[in-house]
Curated annotation (Swiss-Prot):
Pfam families: YbjQ_1. HAMAP family: UPF0145 (MF_00338). The lineage of its organism: Bacteria, Pseudomonadati, Thermodesulfobacteriota, Desulfuromonadia, Geobacterales. It comes from Geobacter sulfurreducens (strain ATCC 51573 / DSM 12127 / PCA). SUPFAM superfamilies: YbjQ-like (SSF117782). Belongs to the UPF0145 family. It comes from the Bacteria. This is UPF0145 protein GSU2791.
Length: 106
């Protein structure tokens, strides 16, 4: 399945619009991981812990998006938008949502 942020796919023609699809992922962060990440951030290093969690959440959201598109008989998802939000008590949770339009292309 083709998943793209663009509204069209070069070399393909959209023959049917199946509807809007979305996928979400909410991950909680471990207290010790957070403490370590904050220390790394304070000394100017990149937080590999947060980067891994962010990538994992993004992968989950896109996988759910693809599954929902397949359920509708789509062969692609266009116009994909990824949104990120830190939430929860003490900002201890990360939410990633992906949405787009499921389509059939030829």
């Amino acid at each position: 399945m083709i998943i793209t942020t663009t509204p069209t796919i070069e070399g393909k023609r959209i023959v049917r619009y199946c509807g809007v699809v979305a996928g979400e992922a909410i991950l909680g962060a471990n207290l010790f991981k957070d403490l370590f990440a904050n220390i790394r951030d304070m000394v100017g290093g990149r937080s590999a812990t947060y980067e891994r969690e962010l990538q994992r959440a993004r992968d989950i959201a896109l996988r759910e998006l693809e599954e929902r598109a397949e359920e509708l008989g789509a062969t692609a998802v266009v116009g994909v938008d990824l949104d990120y939000e830190v939430m929860g008590q003490g900002n201890g949770m990360l939410m990633v949502s992906a949405s787009g339009t499921a389509v059939v292309v030829e």
